């Protein structure tokens, strides 16, 4: 949770010029965070913010080299200026022209509790004194002296290297200013307050001195270089591309909701430990491992520590082992196929020899020999026809029975499935229970086998009902439009069943507030091979990043230990209680579900909008 809070302070304060770090009124801080989270903060979260406000933060950050415009990715790490869509070039230039300042704020990031205007002024002074010396980023990106221009990731690295000279200047002045403030600590402070103030200023001074060292500057540049290379590498991997871009898009949606007044969607800033990142790269020298470390830090919100690094190494080695097994099986299959072809070729040669021999016998044996040869030829032709008929019987259509969500049973065949047909699923009872009243849900949960759901208050159940009672999403996942909205994750085994997820970006609106998050659909393979939905919810972004309730949407795993496989339904005859209505609409880019007040259907209680996968 602390990383998420620090990240929000950085995004709201450091990156976009808010005075979050200077606020003396806790109510103002709370208001900013509640707008970001689109809900009232829990007491525990308020307490964490209070603690955070009192802590010095020198966390290191990196830039994710993507440019979004609305729901489109208009520039990838490897995109050159001439490859940008003509209609988006002016917009991309508006983003690129800000790169020097954005990168500088990233490199000079210091969060100081209480009044820190002296640091902000220092950051501005150093930047304004040196910015005019270096080439304009837009000119660099256009590549005036080069036909091909440079890639976006190369431009980001050039700006980082240009800013290194400012880092030394900033570090020296930061250390001097911190020392001056140590000497000027008011004598009116109590011994405890004086000690605390001095400790904080000494840490700032030490940070400034480290910024002056060649090692720290090289580490800063190298960390960003690793991120650029990893982003480009992950983007090229089919199995990772979609989850990566959906996470990037989700973060952009968060910023747009928090700051609707901004018309430029700048590249994302992410908190990543530079030292851990660089040392891991030096130790393993493996792009596969670095990509896995980055995925865990950025997509699955796990941070970089010894445990996550070890997990990444194990994941890569296991993936390599499985790939080697598949390659061995493929080689074995090819060898068996080659041997089979050779045997078939030998049989053909032998058959041709027999036919030639029979032809010679015909000339020698007269009419009788010819008749015998003809009879034998008929017998062989008959055997071949029998073989063909047997093969046709084996490949004949086998009738299957599939169950559509909310529909009747229908017969299908392996060859008879039409291209326009949708997907077919069963719905588990643990999903359907959320359509009941909060009181009935509580009674069922208290008697159930899932310990984490027991003894919840009615208020908690009502809050959970808002994000779980979305069974209408099944109308989208069974439709042929499903793949435009949902991304399918890799399969994994848990509780004796094969499971996987479908994930989409979404926005939940209630009471004039919006929450950005993921719409999660958890599925498992039933005993008859059917796909069963056992988990369905809208997971707000802040709970995902804070590690609350099940972790990342894209992670391989879930918090449901055991599923009673027999408790599923095809949704036939399902109806809400009388008077409750919702309206579903889709325009191809958004699938919208409006939940209305049963007593006044003109009143919309909440709206869930599922967004199409970003256009690339």
UniProtKB/Swiss-Prot annotation:
Composition-biased stretches (Basic residues): 408-427
Ranges of Acidic residues composition bias in the record: 382-396
Pfam families, alphabetized: DUF1609, DUF3654
Composition bias, Basic and acidic residues: 350-359, 369-381
Segments of this protein annotated with the region Disordered: 350-427
InterPro entries: DUF3654 (IPR022115), UPF0329 (IPR011667)
Family named by the database record: Belongs to the UPF0329 family.
Name assigned to this protein: UPF0329 protein ECU02_1540
Source organism (scientific name): Encephalitozoon cuniculi (strain GB-M1)
The organism's taxonomic lineage, starting at the top: Eukaryota, Fungi, Fungi incertae sedis, Microsporidia, Unikaryonidae
């Amino acid at each position: 949770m602390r990383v998420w809070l620090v990240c929000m302070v950085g995004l709201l304060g450091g990156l976009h010029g808010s005075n979050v770090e200077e606020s003396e009124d806790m109510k103002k801080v709370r208001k900013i965070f509640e707008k970001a989270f689109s809900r009232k903060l829990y007491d525990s979260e308020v307490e964490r913010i209070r603690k955070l406000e009192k802590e010095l933060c020198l966390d290191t950050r990196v830039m994710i080299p993507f440019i979004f415009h609305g729901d489109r990715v208009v520039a990838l790490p490897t995109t050159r200026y001439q490859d940008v869509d003509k209609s988006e070039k002016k917009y991309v230039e508006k983003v690129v022209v800000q790169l020097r300042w954005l990168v500088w704020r990233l490199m000079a990031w210091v969060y100081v509790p209480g009044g820190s205007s002296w640091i902000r002024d220092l950051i501005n002074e150093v930047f304004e004194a040196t910015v005019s010396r270096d080439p304009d980023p837009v000119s660099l990106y256009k590549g005036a002296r080069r036909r091909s221009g440079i890639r976006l990731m190369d431009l980001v690295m050039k700006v980082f290297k240009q800013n290194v000279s400012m880092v030394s200047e900033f570090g020296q002045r930061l250390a001097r200013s911190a020392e001056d403030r140590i000497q000027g600590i008011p004598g009116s402070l109590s011994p405890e307050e004086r000690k605390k103030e001095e400790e904080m200023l000494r840490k700032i001074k030490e940070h400034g001195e480290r910024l002056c060292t060649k090692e720290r500057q090289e580490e800063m540049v190298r960390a960003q270089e690793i991120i650029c290379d990893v982003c480009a590498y992950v983007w090229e991997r089919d199995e990772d591309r979609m989850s990566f871009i959906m996470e990037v898009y989700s973060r952009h949606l968060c910023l747009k909701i928090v700051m609707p007044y901004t018309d430029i969607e700048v590249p994302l800033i992410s908190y990543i430990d530079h030292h851990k990142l660089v040392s891991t790269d030096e130790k393993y020298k493996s792009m596969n491992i670095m990509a896995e470390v980055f995925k865990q830090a950025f997509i699955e919100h796990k941070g970089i520590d010894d445990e996550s690094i070890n997990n990444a190494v194990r994941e890569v080695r296991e993936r390599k082992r499985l790939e080697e097994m598949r390659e061995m099986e493929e080689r074995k299959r090819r060898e068996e196929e080659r041997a089979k072809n050779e045997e078939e070729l030998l049989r053909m040669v032998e058959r041709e020899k027999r036919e030639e021999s029979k032809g010679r016998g015909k000339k020698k044996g007269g009419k009788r020999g010819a008749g015998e040869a003809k009879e034998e030829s008929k017998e062989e032709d008959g055997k071949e026809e029998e073989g063909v008929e047997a093969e046709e019987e084996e490949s004949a259509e086998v009738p299957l029975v599939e169950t559509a969500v909310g529909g009747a049973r229908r017969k299908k065949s392996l060859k008879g499935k039409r291209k326009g047909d949708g997907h077919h699923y069963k719905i588990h009872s643990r999903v359907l229970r959320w359509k009941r009243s909060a009181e009935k849900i509580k009674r069922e949960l208290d008697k159930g086998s899932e310990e984490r759901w027991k003894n919840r208050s009615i208020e908690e159940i009502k809050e959970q009902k808002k994000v779980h009672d979305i069974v209408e999403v099944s109308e989208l996942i069974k439709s042929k439009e499903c793949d435009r909205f949902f991304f399918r994750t890799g399969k994994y085994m848990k509780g004796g069943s094969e499971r996987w997820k479908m994930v989409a970006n979404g926005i939940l609106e209630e009471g004039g507030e919006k929450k950005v998050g993921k719409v999660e659909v958890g599925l498992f393979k039933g005993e008859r091979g059917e796909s069963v939905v056992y988990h369905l919810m809208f997971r707000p972004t802040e709970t995902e990043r804070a590690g609350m309730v099940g972790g990342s949407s894209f992670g391989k795993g879930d918090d449901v230990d055991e599923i009673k496989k027999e408790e599923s339904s095809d949704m036939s005859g399902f109806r809400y209680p009388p008077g409750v209505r919702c309206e579903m609409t889709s325009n191809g880019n958004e699938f919208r579900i409006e939940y209305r007040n049963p007593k006044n259907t003109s009143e919309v209680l909440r709206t869930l909008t599922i967004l199409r996968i970003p256009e690339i």
